[in-house]
Regions:
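A short acidic, Gly/Pro-enriched loop at the edge of an enzyme's catalytic core
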Residues: 9, 13-23
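SAM-dependent methyltransferase
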Residues: 53-116
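C-terminal lobe and adjacent flexible extensions of AdoMet/dcAdoMet transferase-like proteins
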Residues: 113, 117-151
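A short glycine-rich, Lys/Arg-flanked "PGG" loop and its adjoining helix->strand segment in the class I
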Residues: 37-52
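A short SAM/SAH-binding and catalytic strip from SAM-dependent methyltransferases
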Residues: 21-36
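Short loop/turn motifs at secondary-structure junctions
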Residues: 19, 49, 122-124
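Generic structural signal for helix capping and beta-alpha/helix-loop junctions
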Residues: 11-13, 63, 135
Length: 151
């Protein structure tokens, strides 16, 4: 196993096309990509035929309700705005350190935007699950989508 650090959208597709067996995305990364189709297109390109994509991310419900205490709600489930906010982990630091952590920009997607992007970019959806918030189990907090690269 090798670890490569960098912007996945800048990956060398001549070198890494159909190179990866499984892409595992955990803990909220989709909102860092402003164009989900561009992101899913790259994921498809780097996966081998029949490769698996596992996306475990914050539930889009957190766009309107801060069910995970992320301090990042946008106010509208259907908002397509890109907004500036703290990185999700910043809230775990002292205020002094928290102030020094750079802000980043977000684009939060709806469930249909996520699923449709996977489908448009060559994945079949094998499983989709929603998970309760760890703050209030009556509310959705995360989801897991599992897709297979179509040959």
């Amino acid at each position: 196993m090798r670890l490569h650090v960098g912007d996945v959208l800048d990956i060398d597709l001549d070198r890494y096309a159909e190179y990866i067996d499984v892409v595992f995305m955990e803990g909220g990364i989709l909102h860092y990509f402003h164009d989900i189709d561009e992101f899913m297109k790259v994921m498809n390109a780097i996966l081998k035929p029949g490769g698996k994509i596992i996306c475990s991310d914050f539930h889009p419900f957190t766009k309107i309700y801060d069910s995970l205490k992320l301090e990042q709600p946008t106010g509208s489930y259907f908002s397509t705005d890109i907004f500036e906010g703290e990185m999700a982990h910043a809230r775990f630091y002292d205020e002094e350190i928290r102030k020094s952590i750079p802000k980043c920009s977000y684009r939060k997607y709806t469930i249909s935007e996520i699923i449709n992007s996977m489908l448009r970019n060559g994945f079949s959806i094998k499983q989709f699950d929603e998970h309760p918030s760890w703050e209030d189990e009556r509310l959705p907090g995360e989801f897991t989508a599992i897709g297979i690269k179509c040959n």
